[in-house]
């Protein structure tokens, strides 16, 4: 896939009184066309500031911004005219925690408002607005006013409005944080559907790992203006390297706490700890029994969990294997033949390879 967003060595600094605040520090990020890319971090991590550099709503202090093959910012200055920048911004839709709808205007006119500067006729604008409402499941609410809608329905209107200019990129900035869990999932599922149906690239800013886990395929975790970890969702979720990443990935943190509770101490030469990751196709296999039968190892399961990542169930198991050292060395090769991912870990739950 081709990169649709490229951020290189991005710095954003602000002056507060006599102090210089480094909101974003030397960040590099590549988003491929069709990605749903989650940017996760606590409040103040710099994630919204970073993502707003994509359309230069926040101009970097330094670095390079390229969107869809066009160089927007480099050498400490904007590289295109303001007119061209406005055109680029229309190719990037945005939705927020607050819906920002016009309360005195009908739902269909709220969507049509985004097309007021287009070359379409009034009739064409109304037709397009109605089609967008149908796309987000609100065709029956076209003549309603925002106050008559639920929070989830208002966010659907905001999504329809954000899609009015046929953007290739949609930035979702904490768009579900004000919604209840059920409505949150409905909005996330809608974004996933739009990604598949329209080929829409989505950048999902959130402090909620569950939102990323539900729909994203890639993730970056930010802290104090720095990306501390990034990669494919599955890789980061199942094997987080940084402490903050483990906090966001509750399953990994729970596994590590469980290992600590076993108080394993230093492992002897005839003991090894492994993390096993397996797909739904392998769930029915008795891995512990197979290791005993094939390699003569005594295996104890210390922790197990199943998560749904990218709509697929993925199982994780931490095991302690005991036996002859040469047999322990064969665990990884044997299980890989069974399509089970194997990573050796130490007694603290730190990934060694």
Swiss-Prot record:
GO molecular function term, any single one: ATP hydrolysis activity
Residues that, per the record, bind ATP: 41-48
Membrane disposition: Peripheral membrane protein
Lineage: Bacteria, Bacillati, Bacillota, Bacilli, Lactobacillales
Function, in words: Part of the ABC transporter complex MetNIQ involved in methionine import. Responsible for energy coupling to the transport system.
Protein name as annotated: Methionine import ATP-binding protein MetN
Family the UniProt entry places it in: Belongs to the ABC transporter superfamily. Methionine importer (TC 3.A.1.24) family.
Bilayer-crossing regions: none
Its EC number(s): 7.4.2.11
Catalyses which reaction(s): L-methionine(out) + ATP + H2O = L-methionine(in) + ADP + phosphate + H(+); D-methionine(out) + ATP + H2O = D-methionine(in) + ADP + phosphate + H(+)
Metal-binding among keywords: no
Oligomeric and partner information: The complex is composed of two ATP-binding proteins (MetN), two transmembrane proteins (MetI) and a solute-binding protein (MetQ).
Location of this chain's protein in the cell: Cell membrane
Record-annotated ABC transporter domain positions: 7-249
SMART domains: AAA (SM00382), NIL (SM00930)
Pfam families assigned: ABC_tran (PF00005), NIL (PF09383)
Organism: Ligilactobacillus salivarius (strain UCC118)
Keywords carried by this UniProt record: Amino-acid transport, ATP-binding, Cell membrane, Membrane, Nucleotide-binding, Translocase, Transport
A single GO cellular-component term on record: plasma membrane
């Amino acid at each position: 896939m081709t990169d649709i967003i490229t951020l290189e060595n991005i710095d954003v600094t602000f002056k507060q009184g006599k102090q210089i605040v480094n909101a974003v520090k030397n960040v590099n990020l590549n988003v491929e066309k069709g990605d749903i890319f989650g940017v996760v971090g606590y409040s103040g991590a710099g994630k919204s500031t970073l993502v707003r550099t994509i359309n230069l709503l926040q101009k970097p202090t330094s670095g390079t911004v390229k969107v869809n093959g066009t160089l927007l910012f480099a050498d400490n200055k904007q590289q295109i005219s303001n007119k061209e920048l406005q055109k680029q911004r229309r190719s990037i839709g945005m939705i927020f925690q607050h819906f920002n709808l016009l309360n005195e205007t009908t739902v269909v006119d709220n969507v049509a408002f985004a097309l007021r500067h287009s070359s379409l006729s009034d009739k064409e604008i109304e037709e397009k607005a109605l089609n967008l409402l149908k796309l987000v499941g609100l065709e029956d609410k076209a003549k309603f006013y925002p106050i008559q809608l639920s929070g989830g329905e208002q966010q659907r209107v905001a999504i329809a409005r954000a899609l009015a200019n046929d953007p290739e990129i949609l930035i979702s900035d904490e768009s579900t944080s004000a919604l209840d869990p059920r409505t949150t999932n409905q909005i996330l599922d809608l974004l996933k559907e739009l990604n598949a149906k329209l080929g829409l690239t989505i950048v999902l800013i959130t402090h909620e790992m569950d939102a990323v886990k539900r729909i994203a395929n890639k993730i970056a975790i930010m802290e104090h203006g720095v990306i501390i970890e990034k990669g494919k969702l599955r890789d980061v979720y199942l094997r987080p390297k940084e402490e903050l990443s483990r906090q966001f990935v509750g399953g990994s943190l729970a596994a590590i706490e469980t290992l600590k509770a076993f108080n394993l101490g230093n492992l002897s030469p005839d003991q090894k700890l492994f993390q096993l990751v397996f797909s739904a196709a392998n769930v029915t296999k008795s891995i512990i029994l197979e290791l005993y039968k094939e390699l003569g190892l005594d295996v104890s399961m210390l922790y197990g969990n199943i998560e749904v990542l990218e709509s697929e169930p993925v199982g994780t198991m931490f095991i302690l294997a005991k036996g002859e050292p040469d047999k322990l060395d064969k665990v990884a090769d044997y299980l890989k033949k069974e399509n089970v991912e194997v990573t050796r870990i130490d007694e603290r739950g730190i990934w060694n390879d």
